[in-house]
Amino acid sequence: MHILITSGGTSEAIDSVRSITNHSTGSLGKILAETALAKGYQVTLITTPTALKPDPHPHLRLLLVKNVEELLTQMKTEVPQHQVLIHAMAVSDYTPVYMTGLEEVEKAQDLHTFIHRENQEAKISSKEEYQVLFLKKNPKIISLVKEWNPAIQLIGFKLLVDVSSEELIQVARESLV
């Protein structure tokens, strides 16, 4: 059986030195991969450069991604080739579109113009007292998996913070495919 596992957390670049990321360590994905390898399965692990990784193994294929765009490209290729997907990666919900000083935003007639702009500098200047960052929603990759491989067994994870046990159960039931 070929198992695809995702782990770690994506990071979305604001400019060449800044990014939006999360605190995912990849430890769950590492443990899942090690367990599957110990049981004799072929494992493809899609993970991030900073995530914890299992030791090299003859049945382990490691693919590195940094952001949602790279993850989407890898998943489109890999999902059809696997029987099981354990999607344990913390995927960025948003990606930066444009960052500018508050004064420029205040002068704008129409805020929609900012969502069609891109920063031209490799590093955005830090001289402004306040910056405004425009973000765009990323695609929900887990919702595309069954389009790429309707037969795949899909296991997903969702982090919720400060919610009751009842809400956890409700969200889990709503997530069942």
Task: Pin down the residues of each PLM region.
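A cross-family phosphate/adenosyl-ligand binding-site feature
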Residues: 1-177
